[in-house]
Amino acid sequence: MAILGLGTDIVEIGRIEAVIARSGDRLARRVLSDNEWAIWETHQQPVRFLAKRFAVKEAAAKAFGTGIRNGLAFNQFEVFNDELGKPRLRLWGEAQKLAEKLGVVNMHVTLADERRYACATVILES
């Protein structure tokens, strides 16, 4: 196995909070998958939840080397937790097609947050 891509992102949680205060759930609707949306709606810390998902998706887009463009959208990257609570990544649509084209067989996600920041790193393996 070889590393195909590495991406890291850091998000200031207060900026996400300000966007939500200004525009309601528009950012969440753009960023979250349907499954993530269902969690976000009832989450005890929805701003923090959204900030962490945003960080993972930005990191994934960087790992793929594309950014969010050319048919890729935030909601095509879905963050979920495995049975041990470890964050994982599931792809849909154009993101899944790109992963297949590049030969991605494994994706590693690490996620951390503190009072003011959320950060994530994604590694793609062939």
From Swiss-Prot:
Named cofactor requirement(s): Mg(2+)
Keyword match Signal: no
Any Pfam family: ACPS
One GO CC term on file: cytoplasm
UniProt binding sites for Mg(2+): D9, E58
Catalytic activity: apo-[ACP] + CoA = holo-[ACP] + adenosine 3',5'-bisphosphate + H(+)
Top enzyme class: transferase
Function: Transfers the 4'-phosphopantetheine moiety from coenzyme A to a Ser of acyl-carrier-protein.
Similarity comment text for this entry: Belongs to the P-Pant transferase superfamily. AcpS family.
Name of protein: Holo-[acyl-carrier-protein] synthase
Organism, scientific name: Enterobacter sp. (strain 638)
